[in-house]
């Protein structure tokens, strides 16, 4: 069980490093706006949703995608809509002035936002199916249903750990950006997400 947890942790952490997806953009935005707790809860929500996808992929969810080519088409369409919507919101966003007070509601909303964005990003199913297929071929661990849970938990922890680390890095460097610089950065991220579609 421990090897499955550790492999999931490593795969989740390093698989989240590319800063190009919607969750990365949300975490970066919150970090630049000084909304660290909310960004942390976005990371936790996204980590949980993606960890569940990893668990399902480990359990054999890849068969659904392979057996039904329409799933891939629907996946691409849903991802395009999510990225386009986030891109538009970033283009229109105004950075928060100064430090913001974050209460329980902000944390809960951050968690739900992170979970929803990751859960409704069906390309993650395909990504984790591919990762699990490669892992299966590597024979690093045995593939038994009882190892799906520790693998999924490891992925969840690794993903959340990466985004928390990213948030801390952004938080430390945030003072170096002017309000206008943050606004420009958010618009560039929004444009990037729209063009990525």
Segment roles from a protein language model:
Residues 2-73, 130-149:
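Juxtamembrane transmembrane-helix termini in multi-pass membrane transport proteins
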Residues 14-22, 120-124, 163:
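Short helix-coil transition sites and intra-membrane helix breaks within transmembrane domains
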Residues 36-112, 169-173:
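Membrane helix-loop-helix hairpins that form the core translocation module of multi-pass transporters
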Residues 75, 79, 189-192, 196:
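Hydrophobic alpha-helical transmembrane segments of polytopic
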Residues 112-130:
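Selected transmembrane alpha-helices and immediately adjacent juxtamembrane segments
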Residues 144-160:
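Short alpha-helical packing/oligomerization segments
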Residues 167-192:
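Interfacial loop-to-transmembrane junctions
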């Amino acid at each position: 069980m421990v090897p499955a947890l550790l492999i999931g942790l490593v795969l989740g952490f390093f698989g989240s490093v590319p800063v190009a997806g919607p969750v990365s953009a949300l975490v970066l935005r919150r970090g630049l706006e000084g909304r660290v707790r909310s960004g942390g809860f976005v990371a936790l929500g996204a980590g949980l949703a993606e960890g569940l996808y990893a668990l399902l992929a480990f359990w054999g969810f890849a068969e659904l995608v392979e057996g039904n080519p329409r799933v891939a088409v629907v996946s691409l369409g849903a991802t395009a809509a999510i990225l386009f919507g986030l891109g538009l919101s970033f283009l229109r966003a105004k950075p928060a002035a100064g430090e913001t007070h974050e209460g329980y509601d902000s944390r809960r909303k951050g968690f739900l936002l992170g979970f929803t964005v990751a859960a409704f990003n069906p390309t993650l199913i395909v990504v984790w199916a591919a990762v699990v297929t490669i892992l299966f071929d590597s024979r690093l661990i045995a593939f038994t249903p009882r190892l799906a849970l520790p693998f999924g938990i490891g992925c969840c922890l690794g993903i959340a750990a990466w985004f928390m680390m990213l948030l801390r890095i952004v938080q430390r460097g945030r003072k170096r950006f002017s309000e206008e610089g943050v606004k420009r950065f958010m618009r560039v991220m929004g444009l990037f997400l729209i063009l990525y579609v």
